[in-house]
Amino acid sequence: MRSPVLSPLYSGLGAQRYHALSAHDDTEIALILETLENHLSPDLADLRILELACGSGRVTLPMAEAGYRILATDLSPDMLEVLRSRIAEQDSATDAPGDLAARIEVQEADMSSFSFTERFKAVCLPTASITQLDAEQRLGALECSARSLAPGGLLIVSTDDIAAEGTTTIEIQPGISLTEELDQARGRRRSILRWGEECYVSELHLVPSSWISEACTRLRLTIVERHSTPDQAMPDHSGVLLVARKP
């Protein structure tokens, strides 16, 4: 029997499948909005938020709807195209056409290596996207983020703390399943989305929240909040949101 062809999850049709599953996932969103509301200095009110690995806008759109101005970046042109379509669709359905588009600038950028002359009141790296990066790339992402923050600005990063080992498969919907293959010794995690006869893969790294905390400390950022939420679908998984402030 022939093995199924594994296509990338974040490009082509995979990007559309990912968006279809993630669009209604509100994990982290309330915490991120609460963090911005409670921890941002009023002195930074005129500055924008930089979002890394924004994908199809799962976090971008709620931040914009809350009144924030955002530079939304991602390395996947396909994901950014989905985001642009969503912005246009939501704008056309409101009484204030163009309102979201005025608050969101969409730009292609690599989260592990970027440089903007603009300084931001917050840099947001949600959806455990940091797990797509190896150790060197992760350090690059955090260093670039720290440089991009205005004094007093916030770095908001999410990851997964995982104690499980081996392979787990969960059914998301009839005909749609997610398989996770974990290798704790190598620090690797492979996610395979099966959508009918289609298969999409994402090769990830295990990035414990302690690693991010230590890296932030070395960059002279102060951890001000840590939220851990057990994953109800995956055993021995917890989603962690870390918030660090630049002096």
Regions found by a protein language model. Name each.
Residues 1-45:
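Conserved class I S-adenosyl-L-methionine
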Residues 139-151:
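A short glycine-rich, Lys/Arg-flanked "PGG" loop and its adjoining helix->strand segment in the class I
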Residues 57-113:
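Class I SAM-dependent methyltransferase SAM/SAH-binding core
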Residues 156-215:
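SAM-dependent methyltransferase
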Residues 115-122:
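A short acidic, Gly/Pro-enriched loop at the edge of an enzyme's catalytic core
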Residues 215, 219-247:
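C-terminal lobe and adjacent flexible extensions of AdoMet/dcAdoMet transferase-like proteins
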Residues 53-55:
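Class I SAM-dependent methyltransferase "Motif I" SAM/SAH-binding loop
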Residues 124-126:
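A conserved beta-strand element that flanks and buttresses the S-adenosyl-L-methionine
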